[in-house]
Amino acid sequence: MNKKRAKGNSHSIRPVRSGPPKWVRFTREEVELLVEELAKRGYPPSMIGMVLRDQYGVPLVKQITGRKLTAILQDRNMKPKIPEDLFNLMRRAVNIRRHLFEYPKDKSAKRGLEEVESKIRRLASYYKETGKLPQEWSYDPAKAELLVTGSLY
């Protein structure tokens, strides 16, 4: 029986750099203000990084500010309550449940839902250990649907 996933060795490596690149025209304060402005518009942290890279020419926030993007958001009380990767997995699980409601005999979707929900539980236990989630937090599909649709959060 084959392994489920390949090893995945192919990726680009960031160049080693101690300070900000010389061609970046933004100062530390300007980048932090841009991060705050984009967070107020409702962008998640990964989208903030992509917008800064693509539209403003900021390669890495950490190189310019000396701090991670989520640390900047946390200082300004704008960090999301649930970590972004966990929230994205919950969104995926909600979409699969919605699909299974329409097509209940879709066995591969059921298996996919099991895998996504087990990944949610593993990630949640890690975040509880590191203190990013409260100890009493637990995954509930009904609450997840409310979170994803925006009714709760």
From Swiss-Prot:
Chloroplast is among the record's keywords: no
UniProt cross-references to PANTHER family, sorted A to Z: RIBOSOMAL PROTEIN S15P/S13E, SMALL RIBOSOMAL SUBUNIT PROTEIN US15
Keywords attached to this entry: Ribonucleoprotein, Ribosomal protein
Protein known as: Small ribosomal subunit protein uS15
Pfam family, one: Ribosomal_S13_N
Gene Ontology biological-process entries: translation
Molecular function GO terms recorded: small ribosomal subunit rRNA binding; structural constituent of ribosome
Domain of life: Archaea
The keyword Ribonucleoprotein is annotated on this UniProt entry: yes
GO cellular component: cytosolic small ribosomal subunit
Sequence similarity: Belongs to the universal ribosomal protein uS15 family.
Subunit structure: Part of the 30S ribosomal subunit.
